[in-house]
A protein has these predicted regions:
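Histidine-dependent nucleotide/RNA phosphoesterase domain, centered on the 2H-phosphoesterase fold
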Residues: 6-191
Length: 191
């Protein structure tokens, strides 16, 4: 029954992420307000919904229901630490200065790297290619509507100090509909 709702004849686009707790999410919302009121007051941006902030650990892609179940079993076997500290350190474009994506960069701690590696092992084991890219943790704040956006300097946001603990790894389905990305929470794994 659940698969009929989630998959509707198509493979789901799946990603795993750390979802900010209320404290961290409130700090991210305040950061977005500051950006909107200062350097980006005239910018044409699709801002991330305040309820959709997340720090992606692994974007798996299209999965069959059986693969999803196998992934759940693999994640349940991971020994996570009791909590994870997330430290947001700067506002930037992602993956490079020419991009449309506006993000809050997270410090790439050993704990984050270990979670990334453990999850990557699980998805590789069930037939998905290992992520060859360097893991660059971030939380999306918004996306510029125009590819030829003006240049912006985030000097005053180059050393932000936003931090909190998280203790849940979430599995989401991502769906693109009428120019907007919608996320559906499928399952949560508490540390």
């Amino acid at each position: 029954m659940v698969y009929l709702l989630l998959f509707n004849g198509n493979m789901a686009r799946i990603f795993l992420a750390l979802t900010p707790n209320k404290d961290l999410n409130d700090q991210i919302i305040e950061l977005k307000k500051e950006l909107k009121n200062t350097v980006l007051s005239e910018a044409d941006i699709n801002w991330q919904k305040n309820s959709d902030h997340h720090l992606t650990i692994n974007f798996v892609g299209a999965m069959e229901p059986e693969q999803l179940e196998e992934m759940y079993l693999g994640i349940e076997q991971i020994n996570f630490m009791s909590h994870l500290q997330i430290d947001l350190s700067a506002v930037s474009f992602f993956p490079n200065e020419e991009s449309q994506l506006l993000v809050a960069l997270a410090k790439p701690t050993n704990q984050l790297q270990k979670i990334f590696e453990r999850v990557d092992e699980v998805v590789t084991r069930i037939g998905f290619g290992s992520s060859l890219k360097t893991y660059r943790p971030h939380i999306t704040l918004g996306r510029f509507k125009d590819k030829s956006r003006p240049q912006y300097s985030f000097e005053e946001f180059s050393e932000i100090n936003i931090s909190s603990r998280v203790n849940i790894l979430d599995v989401y389905e991502s769906e693109f509909d009428q120019g907007k990305t919608n996320y559906s929470l499928l399952k949560s794994f508490e540390f």
